[in-house]
């Protein structure tokens, strides 16, 4: 046998068992004694590059029984082991972008906000541009653009965003009603989601969200002290009291779609268990924790902060398993998202859908790579009048493809992470095309936790994974 490559693997333990996660195929293998022996041999005596190991197969098989050769052949069939120089296929960058449908459009209803959050990437909601409000005429054209450019897609998604979208309530209401009308005309189901700071919602607006089944995310940072620390009103006073009061009414009124919350985690963050318990007690369906992207040293998470965040993520993950084995859902959405990707065998060539089927539309109709790049001319991708700049889209997708990121080539997370967020890469690495190297070690540890949780739930209550993923089928761990 020739030199073989045990490629893109994450070797982990759960209880007394050992497993392999293969980052190119998404396969998860429970290792028997023969496979364990090979993996340990590869890690100890093979030539390592990233998460891949070159192994002299003849040396390994010398003196070993036939079942070791059978095991290698099985791993080769699964493409976890390959002859040197050959790897499992990666989804290619699209060559004919004209055929790519637009599936999701983020509507920036207004470049303005009534809060002054310390960590806001949008610069008080203005994105470095003059204050702008989307008009009904622009909204109508954006809806028409989405219908036309979604091609044969049976459903599309509209994200209602800002700034603070409720500052432009009349247009928000018009967008939803008009999109539903146009969806019926075009034979498409329109899904809606909305992100808000929660300070301005009225009873009428909450009833509207319920009527149109609008998935709603309220930005809230935990208890009063934690929230008011970084999310003051424009006048300087805390916003917690107003948000808390509105959330209580919102979750009582809006029953047709999940109401979740997003916590921005900055330096000096509140204990996550405290934040999670507090926010779930408010009636939120689930809570997501997002490390701040701000590079200011007073806000950014350092290595010690990230390690502490990971430690607390592990604690919450253990609680999540306890609930899942009782067939209960603990609304820790960071872990839910990882479990969904593992269960569905996610194989991403890009960090996200930005520029593929996902765009942001500015108040005046410009199309941008995503909502974080709103009003940034470098990332203008056309407009709703002349359409997507397909040449720029093709160039951008070629540049952003994970195979362009050399340091990702042998990584076990190649098709889960795919280099991460483009905006954060620009902020932290100075180049949107580079992988988020500052999070690599952290991501490996976090996904390892996710894998350990996954196999525990799969063995104890596999139906739970089907439920949260909406797959209707069980994705098994191979023995």
Predicted regions mapped to residue ranges:
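Conserved alpha-helical substructure of the radical SAM core
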Residues: 63, 67-70, 74, 78, ...
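Acidic, low-complexity/disordered tracts enriched in E/D and polar residues
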Residues: 1-43, 472
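Short Fe-S-cluster ligation motifs
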Residues: 143-161, 396-400, 434-479
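C-terminal accessory region of radical SAM enzymes
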Residues: 308-341, 371-418
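Cysteine-cluster motifs in flexible loop/terminal segments that predominantly coordinate metals
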Residues: 398-449
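Short acidic, hydrophobic short linear motifs in intrinsically disordered regions
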Residues: 38, 47-61
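Radical SAM/AdoMet-radical enzyme domain recognition
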Residues: 139, 143-159, 168-292
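Detector for the c-type heme attachment site
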Residues: 121-126, 256, 412-416, 426
């Amino acid at each position: 046998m020739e030199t073989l490559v045990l490629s893109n693997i994450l070797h982990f333990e759960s209880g007394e068992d050992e497993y392999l996660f293969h980052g190119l195929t998404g396969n998860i293998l429970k290792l028997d004694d023969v496979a364990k022996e090979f993996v340990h041999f590869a890690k100890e005596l093979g030539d390592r590059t990233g998460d891949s190991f070159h192994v002299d197969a003849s040396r390994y098989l010398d003196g070993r029984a036939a079942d070791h050769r059978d095991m290698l052949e099985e791993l080769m069939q699964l493409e976890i082991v390959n002859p040197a120089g050959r790897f499992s296929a990666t989804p290619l960058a699209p060559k004919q972008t004209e055929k790519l449908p637009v599936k999701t459009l983020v509507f920036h209803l207004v470049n303005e906000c009534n809060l002054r959050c310390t960590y806001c990437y949008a610069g008080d909601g203005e994105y470095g541009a003059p204050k702008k409000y989307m008009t009904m005429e622009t909204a109508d054209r954006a809806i028409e653009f989405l219908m036309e450019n979604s091609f044969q897609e049976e459903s599309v998604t509209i994200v209602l965003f800002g700034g603070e979208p409720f500052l432009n309530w009349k247009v928000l209401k018009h967008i939803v009603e008009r999109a539903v009308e146009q969806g019926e005309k075009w034979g498409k189901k329109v899904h809606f989601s909305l992100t808000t700071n929660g300070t301005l919602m009225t009873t009428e607006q909450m009833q509207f969200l319920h009527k149109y089944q609008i998935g709603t995310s309220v930005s809230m940072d935990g208890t009063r002290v934690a929230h008011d620390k970084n999310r003051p009103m424009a006048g300087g006073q805390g916003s917690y009291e107003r948000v808390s009061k509105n959330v209580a009414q919102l979750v009582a009124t809006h029953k047709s779609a999940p109401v979740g919350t997003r916590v921005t985690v900055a330096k000096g963050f509140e204990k996550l268990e405290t934040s999670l318990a507090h926010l779930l007690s408010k009636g939120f369906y689930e809570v997501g924790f997002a490390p701040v992207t701000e590079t200011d040293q007073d806000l950014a998470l350092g290595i010690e902060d990230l390690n502490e965040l990971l430690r607390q993520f592990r604690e919450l993950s253990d609680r999540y398993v306890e609930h899942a084995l009782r067939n209960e859902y603990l609304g820790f959405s960071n872990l839910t998202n990882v479990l969904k990707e593992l269960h569905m065998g996610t194989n991403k060539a890009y960090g996200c859908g930005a520029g593929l089927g996902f765009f942001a539309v500015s108040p005046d109709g410009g199309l941008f790579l995503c909502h974080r790049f709103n009003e940034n001319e470098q990332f203008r991708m056309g407009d709703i009048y002349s359409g997507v700049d397909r040449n720029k889209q093709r160039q951008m997708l070629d540049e952003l493809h994970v195979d362009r990121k050399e340091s990702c080539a042998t990584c076990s997370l190649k098709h889960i992470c795919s280099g991460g967020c483009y905006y954060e890469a620009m902020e932290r690495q100075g180049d949107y095309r580079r992988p988020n190297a500052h999070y690599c070690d952290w991501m490996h540890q976090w996904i390892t936790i996710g894998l350990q949780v996954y196999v525990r739930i799969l063995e104890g209550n596999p139906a739970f994974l089907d439920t949260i993923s909406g797959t209707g089928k069980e994705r098994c761990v191979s023995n």
